[in-house]
Amino acid sequence: MTSAQRKDDHVRLAIEQHNAHSGRNQFDDVSFVHHALAGIDRPDVSLATSFAGISWQVPIYINAMTGGSEKTGLINRDLATAARETGVPIASGSMNAYIKDPSCADTFRVLRDENPNGFVIANINATTTVDNAQRAIDLIEANALQIHINTAQETPMPEGDRSFASWVPQIEKIAAAVDIPVIVKEVGNGLSRQTILLLADLGVQAADVSGRGGTDFARIENGRRELGDYAFLHGWGQSTAACLLDAQDISLPVLASGGVRHPLDVVRALALGARAVGSSAGFLRTLMDDGVDALITKLTTWLDQLAALQTMLGARTPADLTRCDVLLHGELRDFCADRGIDTRRLAQRSSSIEALQTTGSTR
């Protein structure tokens, strides 16, 4: 099977998986304490966020998806158009296909051609050489670089990598060599606290936890196996909400993706400490089912609804959501107990001295 065929398979299987998903994930175990007089005025609300020297006007981004075949090049064209029209940052799919076969360069370059002034993120794997990382950056004139780590995907992948020991030193080399921010991301299995602390030591600028709850690439790769004999890896890892809770009080900026279904999930993730929140499969499905105009409408609606939620919760900025009281339930609460995370502090933080000094209220 060629790389292009595999990329097309990934799109097809991701859409099938999204259509079959039950709709519930651990974001549903996160709720806000409703303070009925916490609301502020909509003109006082900003969606702007910043991290690692990066400033975005919105706290959401179109996360890494695809590229490398004629079909996926058209998808990237439309994703870039939607990003341009809404001001939403966008990440490429893995550019390993381009590194191996430069003839598919246009399927990635279109992300910049259609979005010349937007924030575009290149995506590579953790075995990429420094020179090839720079090639990927240069091709799309990237503003930041994602390095994806995906042992649970590689393991059932028929042609997958089986050697992972080089990843840590190679991430460190790339982070030291390139002159744009480096973000290390999982692909749907989550980053533990220990992993994020290690990434900070390696010199990366941010981590995207990309937890369980959305596209399951172990399931996708197992679906490509003749015998489907790695079904026991389906659902491997920690949820996005669990990863964010595990990362409390770590200095390295954390982004969130994985299982983000709607603006309430975005607000939940921001309240748990994410600086920005990405989504992939839901945006892809809208594009494939209804076209680029529908995706533009969806992104615009999300931004409007995010501002509405911040207004109701009394959060002038996305960062202010970390002062809102949140309650944790079910298995997510059990995870916190086992990992030594104080859930009471999260439920009572609006009345803390720091929150009072910052907001002047008990929101």
From Swiss-Prot:
Catalytic activity: isopentenyl diphosphate = dimethylallyl diphosphate
Positions annotated to bind FMN: 64-66, 94, 123, 185, 210, 215, 259-261, 280-281
GO MF terms, alphabetically ordered: FMN binding; isopentenyl-diphosphate delta-isomerase activity; magnesium ion binding; NADPH binding; oxidoreductase activity
Needed co-factor(s): Mg(2+); FMN; NADPH
Top-level EC class: isomerase
CDD domains linked to this entry: IDI-2_FMN
GO biological process, one term: isoprenoid biosynthetic process
InterPro entries reported for this sequence: Aldolase_TIM (IPR013785), FMN-dep_DH (IPR000262), IPdP_isomerase (IPR011179)
SUPFAM superfamilies the record matches: FMN-linked oxidoreductases
Cellular compartments annotated: Cytoplasm
Entries under Gene3D superfamilies matching the protein: Aldolase class I
Residues holding substrate: 6-7, 153
Binding site for Mg(2+): 154
Superkingdom of origin: Bacteria
A GO CC term assigned to this protein in UniProt: cytoplasm
Documented EC number(s): 5.3.3.2
NCBIfam families: IPP_isom_2 (TIGR02151)
Subunit structure: Homooctamer. Dimer of tetramers.
Family from the record: Belongs to the IPP isomerase type 2 family.
Protein function: Involved in the biosynthesis of isoprenoids. Catalyzes the 1,3-allylic rearrangement of the homoallylic substrate isopentenyl (IPP) to its allylic isomer, dimethylallyl diphosphate (DMAPP).
Protein name stated in the entry: Isopentenyl-diphosphate delta-isomerase
Species name: Streptomyces sp. (strain CL190)
Gene: fni
